[in-house]
Amino acid sequence: MQLLFHLTGIVVLLLIALLCNIYVTRRIIKPRFGKRGATIYMLVHGVAIATLSVIGCIASLGGLEDSIPTLVWVMYGFMLLYVPKLCYTLVSLLDYLKRPRGHMAGYVGMAVAALSFALIVGSTINRYRIDTKEVVVKSSRLPKSFEGYRIVHFSDIHLETLYSRAYAQRVVNCINTLNPDIIVYSGDMVNRKSTELDKYFDILSQLKARDGIYSVLGNHDYGDFVKWASDEARQANLTRLHQLQAEMGWTLLNNASTHIHRDNDSIAIIGVENWGEPPFQQYGDLNEAYPHLYDETYKLLISHNPRHWRAEVLPNSNIDLMMAGHTHALQTEICGYSPVKAIYPEWGGLYNEGEQFLYVNIGIGCTMTPTRLGATPEVTVITLKSN
């Protein structure tokens, strides 16, 4: 079914590309460069379409086991070549609503096409930037010894489609220079398999914080997007991911909790496995992670999916701060708005109900396309203060 879906997508993209090329050839190329120019244009773009299609089909027919990065770049190639043409086509067709046919929509279409091309290229560059955000969370429940406590929060690296050890090193260097008391990672280390971590193990092992590094699993970490030969193979992959994080010096909180002590005070660090709505599996169990959800201890929760906050955390606990990821802001954020808000009302940034807070980090990595239109990769410094 997955293979059929990808092949159908390739066919649809081919049809769109063909129609756009025919239209652009007849509207722009042939009138300006003649029949010979039009023929050369169609041949060059025909080769481009064929090359992308063959690569995409080979990757899809390979069962997608090790082909996701290839398919991502095939999709990006189509975007770069044909989104501008599609924009031009849709806008310039408005000229045909007038008799005799006008030209203004064609000029506007060219401007829109140029803008779309610039946005795609710019979003590719932006995916390798780092936006360090600082927020303050105030609470009357915070113990005095933890006044000014610094949490550095990051999320959603998706190592399979990160493509750059140099960028991973920059992220680690950025975090280490922020003087963290604790580092929190809210899931989706890998895209599909634990082997993705091998290439970056030495870099991520360099992270340092006074009170340690704590993480949870995201929906991608379980290997549920891979067709495994057996349940044993899937479990072995997951176990290996657990082991690698432990070897890096990270503490993976799988429906578990611990306490951090300063002087005579302490706070709780709680982590749940992925809590997700269908089609994602429901692994998270808040009560198992911390049975005394209404005790007087100041509590930090790490949970991958921000919907967990309203669904279970607010109604069933007095947890002070939950940190999540997952949304990526749909890798699109313009003037503080992301279309992912239609799915996740709390999609990025700080939210609160009284003195209960949620922070959603929009992540480091990418899925589907290697682009971030706005939605710059994020590292967050959360400073705890008494209210």
Regions found by a protein language model. Give the residues of each.
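Soluble catalytic domains of enzymes that build or remodel membrane lipids, polysaccharides, and related
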Residues: 144-387
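Generic structural motif
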Residues: 86, 93, 100, 140-142, ...
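N-terminal active-site segment of His-dependent metallophosphoesterases
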Residues: 7-25, 30, 41, 67, ...
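A structural signal for well-ordered alpha-helical scaffolds and beta->alpha junctions
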Residues: 21, 74, 87, 130, ...
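Contiguous N-terminal and early-domain "leader" segments and peripheral loops that mark the onset or edge
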Residues: 105, 117-129, 134, 239-247, ...
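Non-catalytic terminal accessory segments
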Residues: 1-128
